[in-house]
């Protein structure tokens, strides 16, 4: 996949990589989680066949996208020790997409669900009391988005510093 190669090439230049995205950007943060040390995804669309918000693509393409995303998450957690944090509102469609990830990992026998905040090799779902797909905007308006992003960045900076001292 040409995007994966491009992302891998850029990521090689950094001690730590954090992928961050909202909606389909969150989907990309998960799709390429295996070339990151952490992924922070707000309302990702994982299974486009069941998502209420989806592109005009074939069912076969959507199944390949779902499988590629879940495969990347598994590689990220098992091989890289990536910390994946998925944020969702309470809107049932977004929550179903978010909860699909830990359920799929459990079904695959990948023991990574829950864990401490920012724990390596983990998938964590955080639900917020926002009942629509515009979660990142709602968090920003409530002054809650920046602390979430700042925490994720600080964790990666601390890991990079620890590795340099190591």
Show which residues each predicted segment covers:
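Conserved hydrolase catalytic core segment
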Residues: 31-40
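A short acidic, amphipathic alpha-helical/loop segment
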Residues: 28-32, 100-101
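The feature captures the conserved acid-bearing segment of alpha/beta-hydrolase catalytic domains
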Residues: 52-138, 142-164
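Active-site nucleophile loop of the alpha/beta-hydrolase fold
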Residues: 41-52, 90
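Alpha/beta-hydrolase active-site loop
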Residues: 1-12
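Conserved alpha/beta-hydrolase fold motif
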Residues: 17-19
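Gly/Ala-rich beta-loop-alpha elbow adjacent to hydrolase catalytic centers
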Residues: 21-25, 29
